[in-house]
Amino acid sequence: MLFTPGGGSYGNPSLTDFYQELSSGRFAWDGQVSNWTPINGTKADFGANSEAAGDGGDDANGPVSRVVKATLDGLVASGNYGGIDIAKVDKTDRYDCDHDGNFNEPDGYIDHFGMIHAGEGEDANGGPDAIWSHRSYANPNDEQGPTGCKMGGYQLGDTGIWVGDYTIEAENGGMGVFAHEFGHDLGLPDYYDTSYGSENSTGFWSLMSSGSWGSYAEDPFIGTSPMHMDAYAKQYLGWLDLKTLNAGDKATFKLGQAERDMRNNYQAAAINLPTYQRTEKPFPTDGSDQDYLYSGKGDSLDRKAVRTLSGQLASDTPVTVRANYDIEEGWDYAYLDAKVGETWKHVATSASSAESPNRQNFGNGITGTSDGWQDITGTLPAGTTAYRLRYWTDGAAGGEGIAIGDVKFGSTDDTMSDTSAFDLGGWRKVTGGQFTDTFHHWYLAENRAPVLQDRSLCGAYQFTTASWVEKHCYAKGIVVWYRNEGVRDNNTYFHPGQGEILPVDSHPDRIITPDGKFLWSGRWQAWDAPFSLDKQSITLTQAGVGSKTYTAEPVTTFWDSSPTAYYRSNLQFNSVKTAGSDVRLRVLDANADRSTYTVQVDKK
């Protein structure tokens, strides 16, 4: 299923086949599979959920990433690393640890480390003690790791080879879950609403959403043959033959199928929009002091502002940091670090704690809320040659971050009116309590059809009972996506109508269940998203009620006439607020099998 061309005994194309198809032959990969490796512990030791985290938390007994260490210990105990040739596992420097611009060199970490655990995954109804399939980073810190690239993780015995990034899936997992998690390993986010408060419009249109659970129409299972990635994911990875335009350009061209490079036709079109600005007010100023250093906010951050001293401190020196912070308590942390020799030490302060309820405090971390500006005191150790302000967040939720107004010790008084002495490392200077950012956004149009692996678009499913699904075809045609860099996730529950990458539904009005009482899920609200020349229909069954046929009349024109042209307040989580750019895309013609559409882009 993983690397064998044709999938071997799996019967469907392998993961290697799938990614070669996704990339239109631009990406090829191979790997090694170890023998089954016993590890110490039960599935509950690694997969049980805390009450606070709920389903998929896998954190009741500590971070689930401890399974990485247990697996590495098991590989060492096997005597031959489970049959893995470790000379072949480190070829790239994926984060450019030595900052030389060369990613094609070893960095001491296994390039891609995946684990398959026995039994079912929690994500496939394996029970609350099972591990939820995911991609993450094990034991992140900057004190452990190979020489020259200390990014945490765990070492494989004493080989000098470490594991940081990893994925884990269940032994009965379908290829879709493996493909989805590998997508994360390549840098792609989840497209579904990870708050689980709503369903956005991505549905089965992307591997990084429900598309990971796709299968062929005739397949009695789900998740065995995922849908393709969306146009933005392929653009991000450089896997598209792309037509690029700017808003206001007028052009007529042909779009071939997004699922393959047809050479003579484009796979997708990108329409770049004028940038826009937004003013943020993260923290108020501290009295008359107008300037502060700000960490920023977001998921999976590790920002480090470094101030190198002109010499080293001769003795332990009291330090006072003026700060205001709002940090997700127990999960995200800020640190005051001191560099002594070549080692960074986490300084204990009046606001820090050594407690680590979720095993994410690297030591002396600051978390929670300060309720305004306060003085944080501590001691920089003798021999300090630099200090560092660090803000680290995990992959979900989060607060506003932390603001630093002043750092005082000895004769040094670093007010933030001048930050030129800092290597900011992602932090920014804020004046007057606000700053303005500029964001890029654009539309992507792709021709989607149930062909090649994407024939799983005719295996889109919905449950009619707890263990029975019916399958239907998503509509064919031109799917228009709105990519907005000013929105950091697709959690429309928190920002209705807005996401980082969402498909615009050509039929944005609500679809109601046969009894007239409920909305169909977001997956089915978006079934008719494409702009098309054709009338298309599906028949959906509501358990205990009956079936109803829903018809989508042809809609040939996408016209971004206003930000709410395709947004419905009574479908706020599933419809999309667009840019209001006046851009227009018209479907003019198509060949008989709809493998090629002629489209025109202009501005009305």
What role is predicted for each listed range?
Residues 333-347, 388, 418-423:
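Short beta-strand segments and strand-loop junctions that repeat across beta-rich extracellular domains
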Residues 1-201, 205, 209-214:
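Active-site-proximal segment of zinc-dependent metalloprotease catalytic domains
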Residues 329-336, 398-402:
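Beta-strand acidic-aromatic groove motif in beta-rich domains, primarily in extracellular
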Residues 300-304, 311-322, 329-331, 383-386, ...:
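Extended extracellular/luminal ectodomain segments enriched in beta-structured repeat modules
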Residues 2-37, 45, 61-64, 125-169, ...:
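Non-catalytic C-terminal accessory/binding modules of secreted extracellular proteins
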Residues 397-424, 428, 432-435:
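Exposed low-complexity, polar/acidic, P/S/T/G-rich flexible segments that act as propeptides
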Residues 389-397:
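Short beta-strand-plus-loop segments that form exposed binding edges in beta-rich domains
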Residues 269-271, 295-314, 371-378:
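Short beta-strands within extracellular/lumenal beta-sheet-rich domains
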